[in-house]
Amino acid sequence: MTRVQFKHHHHHHHPD
């Protein structure tokens, strides 16, 4: 897993 993918894999809890 590259760093770019890791950055894109953020866990943001926000209501849809």
From Swiss-Prot:
Keyword Amino-acid biosynthesis carried by entry: yes
GO biological process: L-histidine biosynthetic process
UniProt keyword list: Amino-acid biosynthesis, Histidine biosynthesis, Leader peptide
Superkingdom of the organism of origin: Bacteria
Coiled-coil portions: none
Pfam families according to UniProt: His_leader
Function description: This protein is involved in the attenuation mechanism for the control of the expression of the his operon structural genes.
Family: Belongs to the HisL family.
Protein name: his operon leader peptide
Originating gene: hisL
